[in-house]
Amino acid sequence: FGPAQRLHGATYVVDATFRRPELDPDGLVVDIGRAEERLKVALAGLDMRNLDELDEFTGQNTTTEFLARVVFDRLRASIHEGALGEGARGLTGIRVTLHESHVAWASFEGEV
């Protein structure tokens, strides 16, 4: 991976896109307030940390792509736990994008 493999910091802008085939009865894709709250929960513990020191990431190359998948998995779990509300049960997919800069970003997306 070259010089990026050495210890370095990154500040990301994180976007989460929620997908469903039809709007819910309230005209929503997802309750944005709950989605924002759950995104904060998904990111908790990652800020200002050496990610290679976290037990859950032992042996992993903590790339931007890997982190996008971690956030995706956490948001998907929130949907299945009901933390995004009953309306979120109609969601069919999520895309998580981590922007390192205006020219470098990575996304992970999948079905829920």
Question: What is each of the regions a protein language model found here?
Answer:
Residues F1-V112:
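Charge-rich, low-complexity N-terminal segments
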